[in-house]
C-alpha cells in the first residue's frame, strides 16, 4: 500500500528564517508491515503551481486516462470533454506548449472538436441539453455546456447560435421572477456536479453556478439575447438578498465569485467571504476534499478579480498541496475549477520566472546531502529520490519561488480484520448449469456465474464497472454478454474481454447505473475449455468509474463458499496453501524413534521447543508469535533461546492446528519455511511442518501424559547430544 508521509510547501522567503526553510520529515508508521518485506520511500519535488495532472494528461501514460474521446450520453460526453478543454486552456495561459509539442496541442484540439460535435447530438429543439434526447432537459447540464463552450470558443469554432440558444433557454424557461434558477430534471451523473450535490442551500448555489455561466457567455451572447443583462442583474440581486444567511463555505465561495465578476464583492459581503476561509487558505467543509478544491478555486478566482494579491498565495499553496500521489484532483468540477483558477493565477500574477530554489535532502543512509535546483524552465519536471530505509530525514530549501515536497512510503501491509466494502454491497454465486442448457461442443463443463449488487448511497450510482476475473480454465459466454448489452432490456452498457498475463481471462462490464434501492443482478454462462489440476478462484470487483474508492470485491469458486484464495504471499512469490494444512500431531503411538527419524529427514532445517504468546488474526492468514524456549536443532536462521519468532498459517488451517495461547509445542520445518531477511524472519506453517503439543510440567504428572513427556525429553536430549545420525 501507499502511505503519504508528508506534503509540504517549500517557500523559503515566506516560510523560512533568514531565507532558509528547514523541514523535518518523520518516518512512516508501517507497524502493519508484512514481516520480512521491504519498504520504499519516494521523495518528490516539483515547482509550483505547475500542475502534474495536466502534464501527465498531455504527455505520457495518462493521455488515455484523462484526455479521452467523448462518448456515451450527453452527460458522459461532457465529463470526458472537460479535462481536454481545461488542459489546453491551462497550457495556453501558462505558455507551456514548448515543453510538449504543437502536434500534441493539435491532437487535443481535435478531441475537443469531436466532443463538441458529439454534444450537439444531445441538443434538444429548444437548445437545452439532457443525458438523452427523450429526457427532460437539465438546468445544471445546460449551464455547464454554456460554461465549457464559452471557454472552448477560443480553441475551436463554436456556433454562437448553439451557445446563445442554451443561454436563452435558461433565462426564458428556468429563471423565476425573483432571479432564482430552478432544476426540474437533475442530471443522472450526480457526481459530475461537484459541490452542487449537497442539498443544503442548493437553490442559491445553483443560481450562482448558472449566473457564472451566463456572465462567462455575456461577451458572446449579449447582442443575441436581449434579456441577458436583466437576467444577470435579477440573479445578482437574489444572491445579494440571501448572501449574509449562507452557511456553507462552498455556497459563500461560488456566490462570491459570481459577485466579483460584476465588481460587487465589497463591504460586509467581502468580510463574510473572507471569514469563511479556514486558516486563510481554503473554503472547507469537513470530509469533502473535492468540494473543498472546487470551492477554494472559486474563491481564488474571486480574489484575483479583487486584485487582492496578499490573500492569493496561501490559497494557491493549499490548492497545489491537494494533488495526491499519482494523479490529479480526481473529479469533474474540482479539476475544471482548479485549473481554471490556477491558469488565471499565472496570468494575473506572472512572477514565477523568479523561481530559483536549491533543495538539499539529508538522508540517514547517505553520507552527503542530495541537492536539487528548481528553476522556472524546468519547474514542471518531477524530481525524485528513493530510499529503502524507513527513517526520518531533514531537508532545507533556499532561494526564490515556491515548490512542493511530497513523501510517500510504499510497503506490503497485512490485511487486518474483515475486508470492508465501501458504498457497494455485492453477492456472487456460481453453480453448475442445468443439463438442458446448451453448451459449446468442445467445452468440458458449463456453469452459471451470477452477481447481485446495490449501491449504498442516497442516490443511484452512475457509471460503474464490474471487473471480473475468470477461474482458471474458464471463459464467459459471449452470446450471453451480447444479449445483455444489446437486448431489449439492455442490462449492461458494453463489455470488454481481455486475456490477462496469466492463463485467466478478465471481463470488464460497464453499467450506466446501479440502484440504491434494490439489488440489480446479472448472470451469464461460463465454459471450462481445459482441465487444470487446481482451479484457482475468480473474483468480481464493482467500483464507481468516477470514484475509485467506492468499491467492493468478492471471490468465487465452485467448491468454496467464499471463494477465498488459499495462498500465502511474500513479496512477489506466493505459496499455494491449498490442501497444505498441517494436522497437529495427536497420535499417541508416535515413538521416540519416529520423532528422530522425521526430524532428521533431508531438508529439515530447525527443531524448536516453543511457547505460543500471541495470535493475530488477519483476513487470509493467522500469525502465531512463538517464543523459542529451546533450540533443539539450530536452523539456518540462527534463532537464539528466548527470541520471539512469528509463524504464519493460512486461515483455513486454523481448525487443523488447534493452537492455544500459553501452551508449549515441539516444532520443526523445512529450510524453505523461513522467509524474509534477518532479523525479520517469519516461518510458514505448511504440510511438512511438525507441530506437537508439549505438556506443561504439572500436566506431565498426570499418568496419561507421563510417557509423552518422557519421550519428548528424551528426543530433545538425543538431538542436542548426538544430533542426527546422517
From Swiss-Prot:
Ranges where the record places region Interaction with CFP/properdin: 697-722
Positions of disulphide bridges: 581-653, 600-724
Name of the encoding gene: C3
Domain of life: Eukaryota
Record's subcellular location: Secreted
Assigned keywords, A-Z: Complement alternate pathway, Complement pathway, Disulfide bond, Glycoprotein, Immunity, Inflammatory response, Innate immunity, Phosphoprotein, Secreted, Thioester bond
InterPro entries (UniProt xref): A-macroglobulin_rcpt-bd (IPR009048), A-macroglobulin_rcpt-bd_sf (IPR036595), A2M/Complement_sys (IPR050473), Alpha-macroglob_thiol-ester_cl (IPR047565), Alpha-macroglobulin_TED (IPR011626), C3_CUB1 (IPR049466), C3_CUB2 (IPR048848), MacrogloblnA2_CS (IPR019742)
Residues at the site labelled Coordinates Mg(2+) for interaction with Complement factor B Bb fragment (CFB): 726
Protein name as catalogued: Complement C3 alpha chain
Positions bearing Phosphoserine: 31, 384, 636
